[in-house]
Amino acid sequence: MKSLRLEDAVPQSGSRHRKLRVGRGHSAGQGKTSGRGMRGQKCRSGGGVRPGFEGGQIPLYMRLPKLKGFELVNPSSYTIVNLKQLRDLPADSEVNIETLLDAGILTATSGPLRVLGDGEAHVALQITAAYFTASAREKIEAAGGTCTVEA
């Protein structure tokens, strides 16, 4: 078998095209109008419309409403859990991201744990999280549990 050498490499057939020379006589196939058709803005030198121009009709970018606000470059994401999701946990149990994953309450984490106050705290729980809403903290402590904020 012949070895492969750099000087023997050739481009794939059909991948390279010779530059089309237009306006060089009708026998060349692109003479006279050079493939631009008869008259009109698109046949003129420098002719053509700007991107988004729709012939005088109100263009799409003006028909749509302006978008308010902006998107954060580095948005914060948290793992959210509500009190109603913790109702089946046994009393006086430690609650953190790992125990919630083991219990099947969470299936994945997307950042620090935030406890929200939707629902009721039925049993005393020792919850460790990065953030508690005021209503969640109030309900947990009213049920005899503790809220520990992790750094």
Swiss-Prot record:
This is Large ribosomal subunit protein uL15. One of its GO terms (cellular component) is cytosolic large ribosomal subunit. GO terms for biological process: translation. Coiled coil: none annotated. Residues 15-24 have a biased composition (Basic residues). HAMAP family: Ribosomal_uL15. Keywords: Ribonucleoprotein, Ribosomal protein, RNA-binding, rRNA-binding. InterPro entries: Ribosomal_uL15, Ribosomal_uL15/eL18, Ribosomal_uL15/eL18_sf, Ribosomal_uL15_bac-type, Ribosomal_uL15_CS. SUPFAM superfamilies: Ribosomal proteins L15p and L18e. Part of the 50S ribosomal subunit. Pfam families: Ribosomal_L27A. Belongs to the universal ribosomal protein uL15 family. Residues 1-51 are annotated as: Disordered. GO terms for molecular function: rRNA binding; structural constituent of ribosome. Residues 26-38 have a biased composition (Gly residues). Binds to the 23S rRNA. PROSITE patterns: RIBOSOMAL_L15.
